Amino acid sequence: MTLAAAPEAATNDPLFAGLFDRNITSIPSTVEKQRYMTSIAPVAANPGRWIEQPRLPIPVGEHAVIECTGKIHVIAGYARHRVDGGFHQVYDPKSKSWSQKAAFPLPCNHVAGVSIGPKIYTFGGFIEQNRCPHSKCFVYDSTSDTWQPIAGLARPRGAISAIVLDGKIHLLGGRDVRSVEWHEIYDPAADKYTILGGMRGSTGTQPFVGQRDHMGVAVVDGKIHAVAGRMDSYDFNTGLNAVYDPKTDGWTFRAPLPTPRSGVSAVFIGGKIVVFGGEATGRVFGTNEAYDPKTDTWEALTPMTIPRHGLHGATAAVVGNMVHVPGGGPLPGGSVQGAYHDAFTFS
C-alpha cells in the first residue's frame, strides 16, 4: 500500500499543546509541583549534558522514535488534540531540519517501532487513549517513502517494548486491557512470529509472572535488559532490571533502577544503559540514570532540561554520540504533549 505524504505541518504549532483543550499552548503552572529531577545514585564523574535541538513541527506524545539511516523518525502518537495520530515527522541531524513523510497507515498511539537497515517496523498500539489495542503491524521503506502491512500480532496490545537482536525483533510486554508478560520474536525475513515464555518479574526464590508495560529496553553483549515500567498503571511502577539471554532462553536480574518509574526510554551509549524521563502518580521525571553492566552499578547523570514521559521502550534515537529525545508529555497522563527536542551526550 502506497500512501501520500503527510500534510505539511502548520507553522503556528505551539511548544506544548493540550490533548483535548485547544487553549493549552504552554506548560500549565501545575507542572512545577510535579517535576522530579533527583536520584539517590551517586553522581557520575562525567554526568553528560543536554543540548537543545530544533523543535518538532507538531507537538506529540505517546509516539515512536526510531533512528533509520542517520535520520530520526517520529511516528504516530497524541497530537493536534487527538489520540489517533498518523503523524510521521523526520529530523535530519545534518541539516538540522524537519520534514513530513508518508503518513502512518493506522492512526494510533503507543506504537512500538525499530529499524533494520533502511526499513522501519512497527507493532501494535492503541486506537483510543490507552485503550482498544490493535494487532496491525507495518514496515516503512525509507528509500521509497512507502508503508506496507506485515503479519499482525497474534495478541493485540499497545505500549510494547521492541528491540533488535541478531537481525530479529523482540517484542516485550505491553498492555491489552492489563499489563502482560508476553515475549515474542518477529523474523522480518520470514514475516513470522515465534512466541517465547513470559518475561520473569522477580528472583528465582520469589518468582512471579513479569507483567510490564511502558518500560525501557536495551541490548548489551547479546542480552536484552528490560528496565523499569509498570504493572497496569503508574501507581505500580518498578525499577526492575531483568536480563534476557537468548542462548539459555532465561532471565536473570541485575541491580534495579534507583528511581522506579514508567514511560521511560533507554538506550545503550558510551558503554552504559541510560534511562531517562518517565511518570508516576503526581510526578513527571527529569531524572537521568546510567547503568554500568560491567560493575552492576547505577549513577546519576544530568537531568533532562524539561522532564517528560511518553517515551516508553526505546523511544529515543542515537545518532553519532548524541541521544535525541523529541516530544513527550510534561504532565502525568496524556493531557499535554510537547514539541520540545533535546539531545543528551557524554561529550
Predicted regions and their residues:
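N-terminal export leaders
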Residues: 1-4
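Kelch-like beta-propeller repeat domains
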Residues: 13-347
